Amino acid sequence: MAEQSKSKPTAPATSETNPSDCSASPTPENSRRHFLKVSAALAAGGTAAQVMPEAAMAQGAGDIELNRLLQQRRVLLKGGVVLTLDRQVGDFAQADVLIEDGKIREVRPNIAVSGDAVAVVDASNRILIPGFVDTHSHSYQGILRNILSNGRVDPDYNRDIIGTLTPAFTPADAYIGMLSTALGMIEMGTTAVVDVSQVNNTPEHSDALISALQDSGLRAVFAYSDGKGPGVQYPQDISRLQRTYFNSRDQLLALALGAPPDPKMFALAREVGVPIVVHVRNVLPQRNDGEKLLQLSRSGLLRPGDEYIHCLHFPADTWRLIKDSGGHVSLSPPIEMTMGHGTPAIQDALDNGVRPSLSSDHAVTLSSDFFTLMRSTAIAQRYFVLQRGRNGEQNLPPLLTCREVLEFATIEGARCANLDGKVGTLSPGKEADILILRADSLDVWPLNNAPGAVVNLMNPSHVETVFIAGKVRKWHGSLVGVDEQRVRQRMQESRDAVVRRAGFQMNLLG
């Protein structure tokens, strides 16, 4: 997998063709100035183009602890319940996590540090877990959040979102849509995403999407996907994107190809040297993606590291193809049940020896938070298995545990995104993508079972602090260095412009 270089696309400054309503011209410096606070670095003589969001992002001059965190290369998270999800390292009722130069250096009780060159964070009455990994998100749709509250995948989503609203996106709309989703993910505890934004209407749209991901600080796999309109240069533009942004492996952003199960697309992904990410399901007789995967397998085109989304209603033979090829699976149970995709393939995956990852899919109908995802997954699997028992069936599969579902949301997500060498567990040597979750709130306390508290009791409000690659992105409940009021303003302006261009009628009062 190729990863991002330090090249930086230009982020559009406005969603309208006339930029006169903006306070500055559409340069990377000005767009980032609109969205991310870099005032301290600018005052020191730097330019915003030279400053990533992590620089000088204190919530206020009085937050001494945060300022110290931003300045130190070593951070000690002290005295929390630590769920490493690494079976060799183990979990701890009380332990410390030492971060050094963006990586996890040590995990154990009573880590001793000396001197002033370390920032200490009190994690008592907190649960420390790896960050959530969302393996399938149409992230550009942030400005369309919940616009399809009662929608189905067909005809509503395909007609209204893909067919009507997506063609009306400018590069600036793609930027703010992606940025708002990425920042929202960080706020909710998602530290990595496989983005499948199908709004690559022009190369400038693709540049804007990448710019937004870079500006957000979120870890991401950019699965370059299709778009709408005469300016689409998909899929051939993937070569330009790879040359421009993905010639280094030591970055937060990696490249993949989002595509249908088509032999030419699989061949292109192999030629470029990136994984392919495909939506697949059987809706017989009109759609048989399982048969397409069989043909791809016979042509030798299924490879380790490729990702298969939904995988609904597949027979055992298709599951065997995916498993034997080294492929990974992403399931979106809440969306699949709500929008009519079909019965989530949770048990099908498990019965065929595949450990699935979880994904939000999109936010135009439901929340993208992982607490909703984990609970929905656990409830669905347990309901179907228990119902089989009530119907008299014997030799039932085991019920999912909270720890297993938490693994789906973290390490299995990292495996699916081909990031498990970097993140997914709190293991020494991995990059520090870490969540600090409040366990002392009255809706969680007293803490009787840590995995159960995370999966069954918590919601995004319990995500207190978020680290990505050792950098603090959320602190004590607030995003770090983000002008949220300005972001909200630009989201609404962009939403209004897209809806107006598309001639789409919203229904605020439902």
Named regions from a protein language model:
Residues G300-L301, G305, I346-S441, L457-M458:
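His/Asp/Glu-enriched, well-ordered alpha-helical/loop segment
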Residues E65-N67, V199, E204-W319:
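Metal-coordinating catalytic core of metallo-dependent amide/deamination hydrolases
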Residues R270-P275, L301-P304, K323-S330, D351-P356:
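Glycine-enriched alpha-helix->loop->beta-strand junction motifs that scaffold or abut catalytic
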Residues I143-A174, G217, L284-G305, S325-H328, ...:
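Active-site gating loops and adjacent loop-to-helix segments of metal-dependent hydrolytic enzymes
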Residues N146, Y234, M265, L284-L294, ...:
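Histidine/acidic-residue-rich catalytic or RNA/ligand-binding cores of hydrolases
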Residues A2-A95, E100, R105, E404-G510:
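Active-site microenvironment of metallo-dependent hydrolases
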Residues R145-L218, S239-S248, Q492-A497, G503:
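Alpha-helical scaffold segments that flank or form the walls of functional sites
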